[in-house]
Each structure stands twice: as structure tokens, then as C-alpha cells.
Amino acid sequence: MYAVIKTGGKQYKVEKGMKLKVEKLPYEVGQTVEFEALMLRKDDGSIEFNKGKVIAEVKAHGRGKKLIVFKYRPKKNYKRWKGHRQPYTEIEIKDILP
């Protein structure tokens, strides 16, 4: 059985026991999070839309790899360096409920 959930403006296809990194969530490590399933595919092959829940546990918070933003204007002696690290939350899917 798998489900499609939406969080942080993105959609993820998840299965039980799967670990994934999503946009930062306002939960503490160890707390459980409940997502609404946009699509749910059962083991018998049937598909249901906007039904079901996905229960996940927050495993860790972190920051992604550093990205460099560089602005440059030719012939004007204008250069700007800026770094960015996107925060994320790592979750583990505990259960998918129909």
C-alpha cells in the first residue's frame, strides 16, 4: 500500500517504513505528525482519492547543502556573494490508515 501526501508545497509518494526529508515542520524530534492522503492505493489495486491518513514520526531537523548566490555587474566593480542552506525535517512513515 502506498499514499501520496502533500507538505511544504510538494507531493511525496510514501510507503510504510520509508524515511524522507521534507520542508521544515514545527514539531519536536520524536513527535508524531499526521498527514491527509491525497491518493491512497490499497494492496488489492483499488485507488481512493482524498481519503486516508498517514502517520509519521519526526526523526531529525537539519539544514541542506550550502548554495552560493553570486551577483555580478560587468565593468562596475560590483560583486555580491551570499550563501543559503535550506532547513528540512527528516520523517519516518509509521503507518498508512485507509
From Swiss-Prot:
Tell me one Pfam family matched here. Ribosomal_L21p
Could you tell me the Gene Ontology terms of the biological process aspect for this record?
translation
Q: Does the keyword Nucleus apply?
A: no
Q: Which domain of life is it from?
A: Bacteria
Q: Which GO terms describe its cellular component?
A: cytoplasm; ribonucleoprotein complex; ribosome
Q: Which SUPFAM superfamilies match?
A: L21p-like
Q: Which cysteines are joined by disulfide bonds?
A: none
UniProt keywords (A-Z) are: Ribonucleoprotein, Ribosomal protein, RNA-binding, rRNA-binding
Among NCBIfam families, the record links this protein to:
L21 (TIGR00061)
Q: What does this protein do?
A: This protein binds to 23S rRNA in the presence of protein L20.
Q: Subunit structure, per the record? A: Part of the 50S ribosomal subunit. Contacts protein L20.
Q: What is this protein called?
A: Large ribosomal subunit protein bL21
UniProt source species: Aquifex aeolicus (strain VF5)
